[in-house]
Amino acid sequence: MAAVQEILGTYSPEDLIITISNQFFSHSITGYADGTFVSVARQVPPSTLYTGSDNTNARVVRANKGSTIKVTLHQASESNDILSQALIMDESTRDGTWCFNILVKDGTGRSLYFSPQAFIANNPESTFGAEISTREWDIQCVSLSNFTGGNGKLTDDAYRTLQAMGVTVDPRWAPA
């Protein structure tokens, strides 16, 4: 039984996969910028606390899973062309035909994000100078299912807890 201090987690940015696809195309995004190149955020929290003036409390629960995935690419990335064209096609048809599904998967960990309906919100701000610049793409997701997980083997305690919560753990993450 390994203690949490004895577990070495591993993360590799080269193993993060972002794929967009619909009935017309499938594309694995490449050309990530240096530094933070993807962020995932829900637009409305799943629950918020309400406190009355007499210090009574309630919780507001929301089912809205609308989310934003921000992908930052360097300007030389060919994925800029794909995302630009997807936006152009979506703007020209204006009927959702060019919406796509999106998958973000950490290949060295357990994090996984998926939306069956997403679209490019806007063109990124473009700057040009003596250095390579970046392009930040906002991808709006209608309903995002997400699992934010770790990147190392699980301890016995975490493994048992996840099983008690009804999670089937991939054997590669089971305690050694």
Task: Tell where the protein language model's regions lie, with residue ranges.
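Intrinsically disordered, low-complexity terminal/linker regions enriched in Pro/Ser/Gly
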Residues: 2, 149-176
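Solvent-exposed edge beta-strands and adjacent loop segments
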Residues: 2-78, 118-135, 164, 175-176
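Short, surface-exposed beta-strand/loop "edge" segments at domain boundaries and coil↔beta transitions
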Residues: 24-29, 79-80, 105-115, 147
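Residue-level recognition of well-ordered beta-strand positions that form the cores
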Residues: 70-74, 103, 138-142
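"Short basic amphipathic alpha-helical interaction patches in structured regions
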Residues: 83-92, 115-119, 153-156
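Short, acidic/charged, Gly/Pro-enriched secondary-structure junctions
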Residues: 85-113
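Short, intrinsically disordered/low-complexity patches at protein termini
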Residues: 93-95, 136-139
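Hydrophobic lipid-interacting interfaces of membrane-associated proteins
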Residues: 142-149
